[in-house]
Curated annotation (Swiss-Prot):
It comes from Mycobacteroides abscessus (strain ATCC 19977 / DSM 44196 / CCUG 20993 / CIP 104536 / JCM 13569 / NCTC 13031 / TMC 1543 / L948). Mg(2+) 1 binds at E106, N557. Mg(2+) 2 binds at D130, D287. This is Phosphoribosylformylglycinamidine synthase subunit PurL. SUPFAM superfamilies: PurM C-terminal domain-like, PurM N-terminal domain-like.
Length: 761
């Protein structure tokens, strides 16, 4: 042991020793509470543990009082298919035939601004390990990305690094990236959002949970060695404040606060874990992500039926001279912590050797209720684990509707100049699809492997992705993620429901039945009452919406302090929806022209709704008014029609309507199918409203002419509005709006696909 180590005995004998708790993010009263819990001052290692585990990121101390609403509103019927939910590493849902799917979305926002490549890459790696920790094989990833204005000076640096990081890590893991969403807005300058979703598949009986039980069971750390990367994010942990000479402290301050990922280590770690699960060698397991060993040990111990002893000096290190505080707080990637019975340790180690994965017994489960950590024989941590992992501070932050909200709502898009001629309508279309907001994302998705492993059935950016789960039966899943910061700023409750509705609709448009929800709630500072009002309203909106739709929230993530200076980002609740499809061969594609002779039918009602729209932003740089109405009962009906139509082969293509309205969906489906079409707008309809309205609850479908009558009868029987608006012209080279304008596919493709390469290529 070196002289710089602060032991429990030393802490007890030096009660007045000054400690840098404020620099570590702890408030005066939080530090006082730690002293009260321990009956003494904490050691440096204990202070490190409490500071990271009581952080906003780990403890949810500002959001917990609001997040409880999800549990309060979830009915037993909604929970019926849920095998694991909020509080676990990821939600798990029974999808039938003995299969289960686990999925979750998490943020890696701040690291992705500091070091975009590694921030995004380790964001993917972290969420993949969450899925692995449930006993599942990861099968797909998606991403929700937000950047500053596309032409802003720093956007290129962040965009390039994030996209390369996601692709570099995911491609190396052999995981298909099956969709997502990319948005550019000035509010995200200096604070990009990188939200990564991963889904995994397992047999129901193979589910694993994070807990340590059975006195005498061994704690095994396996995967990469532990280094100093990731520590800078918790301020002075790597500095001389914890002892050591000035030169050593100065050098450590230069270490990266962003973790460094190695996807090839994670790839063998995945296979190693799956073999360990198959051999039934694991009692409990936890991945090491945020807060590292501090989190893994305290969460495993507090979720079990005993205590835990850890010999911290047995942790394999890749840096010399690390202190206990640094070892506990390191966020080095590609590490897992397992609970293993003594008789299975040798077999566990043999599997790890087979995969060339480093594994070390670092401790054991004990009787009692203490987490005790030693360093070269001396105790540096002796705490009740629940006080670290689950009993941190909980705040009821002030909540206040902003004084500016009424003025924002009053500033509607109603008075904005609209295109008044056919030529102006045509130019509006070209301006919209040629803007960074609605242009093609192919420049991004081409950097991702969407079809690796051979089970990807559908992978359309901004729509749902479909993955085959069972090769024999064709059973599969659909996933979609959506968010609208613009709508949520105008009305947080409705904005969250619109995001839910769009993700739900995207899943249904593929032919799948939506069954469960995950979320990642990205907001500004919780110390701002206006931000907390946005947050609380968004949580209520999402929870109430799930009740109406009858599907549960299985888990999620909260990311606060997303702001530049005192200016917060647009409030961005990202919603992910999981759907189940009995036979992926019946999935509905996006592109026109899969069947000869198709009629285009618009499902749902169109209203004059342009507040918060992309048209208002592109044409007038305007944001104000009230978002489109949301009718979740109608969304449910729409989904039922689409899944029935998919099953019966009545629909050959489908595309939800959202940003950019009908004409945006038409252009994307025409380009996807490489075939033109003719639109005939309803008699008396305002062409601008018909083409560009962003009314929710609508889907454009292509129906084989032989099935048109049957499909329309189905819609009529279910009282779902459906109107014929055109035909697909196979062999045609243009999109024509009869009586208004025509644009060739070549011109549309050139404009639509040239924007991002021009900006970032």
């Amino acid at each position: 042991m070196t002289s710089r180590v602060d032991t429990v005995d030393n802490a007890a004998s030096t009660p007045d020793h000054p400690q840098p708790f404020a620099e570590l993010g702890l408030k005066d009263d939080e530090y006082a509470r730690i002293r009260e819990i321990l009956g003494r001052r904490p050691t440096d290692a204990e202070l490190a543990m409490y500071s990271v585990m009581w952080s906003e990121h780990c403890s949810y101390k500002s959001s917990k009082v609001h997040l409880r609403y999800f549990g309060q509103t979830t009915t037993e019927e909604m929970r019926s298919a849920m095998l694991a939910g909020i509080g676990e590493n990821a939600g798990v849902v029974d999808i039938g035939d003995g299969w289960a799917v686990t999925f979750k979305v998490e943020s890696h926002n701040h690291p992705s601004y500091v070091e975009p490549y590694q921030g995004a890459a380790t964001g993917v790696g972290g969420i993949v390990r969450d899925i692995m920790a449930m006993g599942a094989r990861p099968i797909a990833v998606m991403d929700q990305l937000r950047f500053g204005a596309a032409d802003a000076p720093d956007t290129r640096r962040v965009f390039d690094g994030v996209v390369r990081g996601i692709g570099g890590y995911g491609n190396s893991l052999g995981l298909p990236n099956i969709g997502g969403e990319t948005v550019f807005d000035a509010s995200y300058a200096g604070n990009p959002l990188v939200n990564a979703l991963c889904a995994g598949v397992l047999r129901k009986e193979d589910l694993h949970l994070a807990f340590a039980s059975g006195a005498g069971n061994k704690i095994i750390l396996f995967g990469a060695r532990t280094g100093l990367d990731g520590i800078g994010g918790v301020s002075v942990l790597a500095s001389e404040t914890f002892g050591g000479d000035e030169a050593d402290g100065a050098s450590r301050k230069k270490l990266p606060s962003v973790q460094v990922g190695d996807p090839f280590t994670e790839k063998v770690l995945i296979e190693c874990c799956l073999e360990l699960y198959a051999a039934h060698l694991v009692v409990g397991i936890q991945d090491l992500g945020g807060a590292g060993l501090s989190c893994a040990t305290s969460e495993l111990a507090s979720a079990g039926d005993g205590g835990m002893h850890i010999d911290l000096d047995k942790v394999p290190l890749r840096a010399t001279g690390m202190t206990p505080a640094e070892v506990l707080s390191s966020e080095s990637q590609e590490r897992m912590c397992a609970v293993v019975t003594p008789e299975n340790v040798d077999a566990f180690m043999a599997v790890c050797r087979k995969w060339d994965v480093l594994a070390t017994v670092i401790g054991e489960v004990t009787d009692g209720d203490r987490l005790r950590i030693t360093w070269h024989g001396e105790t540096v941590v002796d705490v009740p684990p629940r006080t670290v992992a689950h009993e941190g501070p909980v705040y009821q932050r002030p909540v206040a509707r902003p004084d500016t909200q009424d003025a924002l709502i009053a500033d509607t898009a109603g008075g904005l100049a609209r295109p008044a001629s056919a030529a102006e309508l045509r130019q509006t279309l070209l301006d919209m699809i040629g803007s960074p907001h609605l242009c093609s994302r192919a420049f991004i998705t081409e950097q991702y492997d969407r079809y690796v492993r051979g089970n990807t059935v559908l992978a359309e950016h901004a729509d749902s992705g479909v993955i085959r789960v069972d090769e024999q039966t064709g059973r599969g899943i659909a996933l979609a993620t959506d968010a609208s910061g613009r709508y949520t700023l105008l009305d947080p409750y409705r904005g969250a429901q619109l995001a839910l509705a769009e993700a739900y609709r995207n899943v249904a448009a593929s032919g799948a039945t939506p069954v469960a929800v995950t979320n990642c709630l990205n907001f500004g500072s919780p110390e701002d009452p206006g931000v907390m009002w946005q947050f609380s309203e968004a949580v209520r909106g999402l929870a109430d919406g799930c009740v109406t739709l009858g599907i549960p929230v299985t888990g999620g993530n909260v990311s606060f302090y997303n702001q530049t200076g005192t200016t917060p980002i647009l409030p961005t609740p990202v919603v992910g929806v999981l759907g189940v499809i009995d036979d992926v061969n019946r999935r509905i594609p996006t592109g026109f022209g899969t069947e000869p002779g198709e009629t285009l039918i618009l499902l749902g009602d169109t209203a004059d709704e342009f507040d918060g729209s992309i048209w208002a932003q592109v044409a007038h740089d305007h944001l104000g008014g009230t978002p489109p109405k949301v009718d979740l009962a109608r969304e449910q009906l729409l989904a039922q029609v689409l899944t029935a139509a998919s099953r019966d082969g009545l629909v050959s293509a489908a595309h939800d309507l959202s940003e950019g309205g009908l004409i945006q969906a038409v252009v994307e489906s025409a380009l996807a199918g490489e075939t033109g079409c003719r639109l005939l707008l309803p008699e008396g309809a305002d062409p601008f409203v018909a083409l560009f309205s962003e009314s929710a609850g609508r889907v454009l479908v292509a129906v084989p002419r032989t099935e048109e009558s049957r499909f329309m009868s189905m819609c009529e029987a279910r009282q779902l509005p459906a109107v014929r608006i055109g035909v697909v012209d196979q062999g045609s080279d243009s999109v024509e709006v009869q009586g208004q304008f025509s644009v060739t596919l070549a011109e549309l493709r050139e404009i639509h696909e040239g924007v991002l390469p021009g900006l970032f290529g």
